[in-house]
């Protein structure tokens, strides 16, 4: 059975894609009222603006009203996934090749549960990271969570835009 987050993702993802956005993450926060937080990114590597979030929010709100997936009162928050965005799908790793990433694992790998390094490649459900001077091979199914890291190199590129 799918979680409510997965159900929401299923009903909004296609509309967001049609609008030029990638659905990054759906999560619930708070208790009464619940907050449905939705993180989006641009499919064409453009920055996400406040106007983009507003457009996406209106579309998502209309869909959720029709689908009626959430029983209790809730508040909807749509935001950019940010510079240190989470990587939640395997395809994300190929999109961000050569970028620095922090990964937390569900269990120990070589005596560690946390790795930070550059993504070298992602194939066959494996992530190849360059951590310091060694290459680490991580099975995608072992990943608990992963986020991009804002490095000086990325920051300088942003300043040039």
From Swiss-Prot:
First-listed, main subcellular location of the protein, grouped into a coarse class: cytoplasm
Key words, A-Z: Cytoplasm, Ribosome biogenesis
Compartments where located: Cytoplasm
GO biological process: ribosomal small subunit assembly; translation
Entry keyword Magnesium: no
InterPro entries: Ribosome_maturation_RimP (IPR003728), RimP_C (IPR028998), RimP_C_sf (IPR036847), RimP_N (IPR028989), RimP_N_sf (IPR035956)
Recorded GO CC terms: cytosol
Classification via Gene3D superfamilies: Ribosome maturation factor RimP, C-terminal domain (2.30.30.180), RimP-like superfamily, N-terminal (3.30.300.70)
SUPFAM superfamilies: YhbC-like, C-terminal domain, YhbC-like, N-terminal domain
Family annotation (PANTHER family): RIBOSOME MATURATION FACTOR RIMP
Family note: Belongs to the RimP family.
Function: Required for maturation of 30S ribosomal subunits.
Protein name: Ribosome maturation factor RimP
Gene: rimP
């Amino acid at each position: 059975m799918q979680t409510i987050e997965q159900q929401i993702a299923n009903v909004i993802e296609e509309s967001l894609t049609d609008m030029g956005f990638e659905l990054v993450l759906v999560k619930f926060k708070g208790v009464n009222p619940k907050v449905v937080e939705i993180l989006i990114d641009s499919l064409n590597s453009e920055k996400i603006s406040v106007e983009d979030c507003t457009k996406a929010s209106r579309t998502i709100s209309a869909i959720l009203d029709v689908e009626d997936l959430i029983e209790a009162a809730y508040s909807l928050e749509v935001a950019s996934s940010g510079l240190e965005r989470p990587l939640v799908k395997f395809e994300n790793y190929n999109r961000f090749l050569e970028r620095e990433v922090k990964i937390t694992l569900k269990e120990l790998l070589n005596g560690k549960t946390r790795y930070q390094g550059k993504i070298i490649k992602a194939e066959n459900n494996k992530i190849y990271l360059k951590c310091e001077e060694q290459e680490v091979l991580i099975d995608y199914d072992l990943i608990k969570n992963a986020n991009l890291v804002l490095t000086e190199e990325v920051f300088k590129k942003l300043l040039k835009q």
